[in-house]
Amino acid sequence: MAEFETIIGLEVHAQLNTESKIFSTSATKFGSPPNSQTNPVCLGLPGALPVLNESALEKAIMAGIAFGCDISLFTKFDRKNYFYPDLPKGYQISQFDKPICTGGGVTFTIKGEESSRYVRLTRIHMEEDAGKLIHSADPNIPQSYVDLNRAGTPLIEIVSEPDMRSSDEAYYYLNSLKSILKYIRVSDCNMEEGSLRCDANVSIRPKGSDKFGTRVEIKNLNSFKAVKAAIDYEVEWQTEMALEGKTFQQQTKLWDSVANKTVTMRTKEMSHDYRYFPDPDLPVIILQKETVESVRSKLPELPNERKNRFVEKLGLPKYDAEVLTAEREIADYFEDALKVSGDAKKTSNWVKDEVLGVVNKESITISEFSVSAQRIGGLVKLIADGKISGKIAKTVFEELLISDKDAETIVTEKNLIVVRDDKEIERIVNEAIANNQDAVAKYKSGKDRALGAIVGYVMKVSKGKADPELVNQMLLDKLGSLPPKE
């Protein structure tokens, strides 16, 4: 049986989160009534001239810098000509041979692997989005409606080299790309709202061959899971075709998420089919190096850089660092809490386990979480300073969720400070030993885990307020002085 190698390249369209459209002053707010965010430019009315949105240009440059691209100091816009109901001008303003960014790449790590992988980028170019067709849900009314609110929304198209060899690589590449775009805040990357869309180019070839096979472009991929599933299906289909000695044309397919298969949409057009030519209404763009450096100075610390700092400077485990840097807002929250607590590992545990536990359970973002980073930091500081135990901290956390008080106020009002009175703890320890003779016997016979039952008794009697370290040390001393059980 012949063995084949999968070749994958991805084209990602990311809407830039500007207030207005790329060539007009119309708003870009999602969810507005149909055709309420249009003007003569995005409607393609005669005599309406486009003017480039400077903010869109800056965000495109920032994305290029973040991905390590070369920023073109000379760039221009071109008309991509085709006819479709959601394109009122009969052409799309895009970039053909002089994109704003070239080269660069995306580094990512597949879950469970130690080493990272790198996928090269071909280019990043700017273009305007098309409108949206809304099809009638009633099969007896074969009508489609056009909403041009989205027409003219600024996009960057991020085109990768065909460097990926599996759907897993594509999946984690997309996760890393999305994380970077959100970190630098040029796009909200909300796939449900269509602000991040992906097309996959898939082909196979015999292993060892350096020639590319016939390529299929897959569209209608509205989630990363859909990208993975579509690639897996397409690779299986192409492999079956090859094994049966059949050929097929280069084509565009749609992903049918109901049937879980790719469906042919049309034979693939080549670039000459679009009759690209420079847009005569838009002047060429000549950037100054100072402009690029000004944008570079605004670039925040990127996810991989931040993750490495958390591991190398703060001493966090790699897993913790990956969780905390998955989103910029989470990493910011952690660092703000750390400024108060002073203990990186304890703060990490509380943010990734307790805070994100609530965030995920309630399906909210961390910016919507009711407890500020400073209040969580205050709670962790009480733990780090030995003023409260982990068990008491959970009680305080529950109170933080429903009140505006800080942790120290809650601990004081509820008298939850850890008990360090030697005589009081010794009294409870003696009681625990006397009332847990079975556990004492097991411990003395070498079953160290039996100590937990005795400690649990002490914590129950003290209502969780006894100093755990003092309890453990006192128990070990007292049990060590007892004769071993026969």
From Swiss-Prot:
The gene is gatB. GO terms for biological process: glutaminyl-tRNAGln biosynthesis via transamidation; translation. Heterotrimer of A, B and C subunits. The lineage of its organism: Bacteria, Pseudomonadati, Spirochaetota, Spirochaetia, Leptospirales. This is Aspartyl/glutamyl-tRNA(Asn/Gln) amidotransferase subunit B. PANTHER family: GLUTAMYL-TRNA GLN AMIDOTRANSFERASE SUBUNIT B MITOCHONDRIAL AND PROKARYOTIC PET112-RELATED (PTHR11659), GLUTAMYL-TRNA(GLN) AMIDOTRANSFERASE SUBUNIT B, MITOCHONDRIAL (PTHR11659:SF0). One of its GO terms (molecular function) is glutaminyl-tRNA synthase (glutamine-hydrolyzing) activity. It catalyses: L-glutamyl-tRNA(Gln) + L-glutamine + ATP + H2O = L-glutaminyl-tRNA(Gln) + L-glutamate + ADP + phosphate + H(+); L-aspartyl-tRNA(Asn) + L-glutamine + ATP + H2O = L-asparaginyl-tRNA(Asn) + L-glutamate + ADP + phosphate + 2 H(+). HAMAP family: GatB (MF_00121). It is an enzyme of class 6 (ligase). Keywords: ATP-binding, Ligase, Nucleotide-binding, Protein biosynthesis. It comes from Leptospira borgpetersenii serovar Hardjo-bovis (strain L550). Allows the formation of correctly charged Asn-tRNA(Asn) or Gln-tRNA(Gln) through the transamidation of misacylated Asp-tRNA(Asn) or Glu-tRNA(Gln) in organisms which lack either or both of asparaginyl-tRNA or glutaminyl-tRNA synthetases. The reaction takes place in the presence of glutamine and ATP through an activated phospho-Asp-tRNA(Asn) or phospho-Glu-tRNA(Gln). It holds the Pfam family GatB_N. Its EC number is 6.3.5.-. It comes from the Bacteria. SUPFAM superfamilies: GatB/YqeY motif (SSF89095), Glutamine synthetase/guanido kinase (SSF55931). The keyword Ligase applies. InterPro entries: Asn/Gln-tRNA_amidoTrfase_suB/E, Asn/Gln-tRNA_Trfase_suB/E_cat, Asn/Gln_amidotransferase, Asn/Gln_tRNA_amidoTrase-B-like, GatB, GatB_C_1, GatB_Yqey_C_2, Gln-tRNA_amidoTrfase_suB_CS. Belongs to the GatB/GatE family. GatB subfamily.
